[in-house]
Amino acid sequence: MRAGRDERAWIRGAQAGSASDLEALFRSHWPSAWRAAFLVVHDAAAAEDIAQEAFLAAIRNLDRFDRRRPFGPWLHRIVVNRAIDWARARSLRAELELVDAAAPAQPPEVGSDVVGALRRLSPEHRAVIVLRHLLGYTPGEIARLLELPRGTVNSRLRRGLDQLQETLP
C-alpha cells in the first residue's frame, strides 16, 4: 500500500511544481509505459517517442488529474491512444518496412512467436489484447481507459484472440 501513498504524494508534489516528484513518477511508470507502447507498435524507437510524448501530455494535463485515482491507468490510456494513432498513421503510409531483420529485443516475458502474431493484428485489436493479457487490465478497465463500450472491448478481445489462435502454433 505504501507505493500508492508514495504515488499520491508524488502527484501532489508534481502538481505543485516539484521536479523531484515528477522524476519519481516518471521513473516509477516509464517501464510499463514504454512496454505498452512497444507491444502496440513493435518499434523500440517509436515506443520510446510515444511514451515520452505521453508523459509530456500527462505533465501538461496534471492539473486536471484526479489524485484519488491511480496514475498508471491514466498514463496507459494516453500511451495506448498515441500508440494506436502512430500505428494507424504508419499503416496508412505506403512504405513497407522490413523490420524483422533488425527487430529490437523483445520483452523477455513475451515470446517472439507471440510478438509476431500480435504484429498481424490491427492496432485496435492489438491494444486491447496487450492491455488485457500483458498488462493485466480487466475488460471494464480497458473500456474506461480507451473510452469504448464494454461490448466493443469484449468483441475486440474475442476477435483478436481468435486471430492469434489462427496464427500461433
For each predicted feature, which ranges?
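C-terminal edge and immediately downstream basic/flexible tail or linker adjoining helix-turn-helix-like DNA-binding
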Residues: 2-3, 13, 42, 99, ...
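A short pre-motif secondary-structure segment
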Residues: 128-132
